[in-house]
Amino acid sequence: MKLTLRHAVPADVPTLRVLIDTSVRGLQAADYTPAPIEGALQSVYGVDSQLIADGTCYVVETGDASVVACGGWSKRKTLFGGDRWTAREDALLNPQQDAAKIRAFFVHPNWVRRGIGSMILEACEKAAAAAGFTRLEMGATLTGVPFYSAKGYVVLESIEALLKNGESLAVVRMEKRNGSG
């Protein structure tokens, strides 16, 4: 099946909301219990409109125009979190000293292990390099750590994101030198 990578646009937001919910519920249950998943869906996980406005969010769609994955990179300080996440820092980064942020990767459970996440990650890494960034950083879910490790990212630290429902979500801060694999 033909897959197309393109920049996300504001009209994609309703579709992305459904994709994110489906991806999280379908893929993260092995790594998180229901309470943190629900809390994260109400606060951390979600569409980041700033990524779309900045032109740094991508979607992959099938031949019938169904969006099956999304992900992006950011030139802003926010490490993770959608529009509802209160710990956002939208100040711009300095490419000479800061790491670009890899952000908001979600793949539909029926479309995993087909190279789609790799396709988006490669586009993000190339775009960040073109913008002058030599390092990349992310807040990965426990579910995503094996994928990112295989792509050359190394673990820096574990973070507990406090959620509105009183739960916490384990997030792993990872980094890579851009162009290193």
Protein language model annotation of sequence segments:
Residues 54, 66-112, 122, 127, ...:
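Conserved acyl-donor/pantetheine-binding loop and adjacent beta-alpha core of acyl/acetyltransferases
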Residues 115-117:
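Conserved G/P- and acidic residue-centered "switch" motifs that form tight phosphate/ATP-binding loops
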Residues 21-46:
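Conserved GNAT-fold acetyl-CoA-binding loop/helix
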Residues 16, 48:
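Hydrophobic pocket/interface hotspot
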